[in-house]
Amino acid sequence: MKHVNTLLMQELRLLICELKRLRLSAVSDPDFSQEKIHAELDSLLCKLSRHFD
């Protein structure tokens, strides 16, 4: 079980990094559309939900 928890924590850290990158892109890149933000968030939610479904 400890191995599973470690893998989950690694995955959560990666998702947090991706969310920070998305936030930075959304703020700093004028060509970053709402549709792209929604697509990125949907992708991250799918990755996260794999662990809890």
Curated annotation (Swiss-Prot):
It comes from the Viruses. Gene K overlaps genes B, A, and C. No function has yet been ascribed to K protein. This is K protein. It comes from Escherichia phage alpha3. The gene is K.
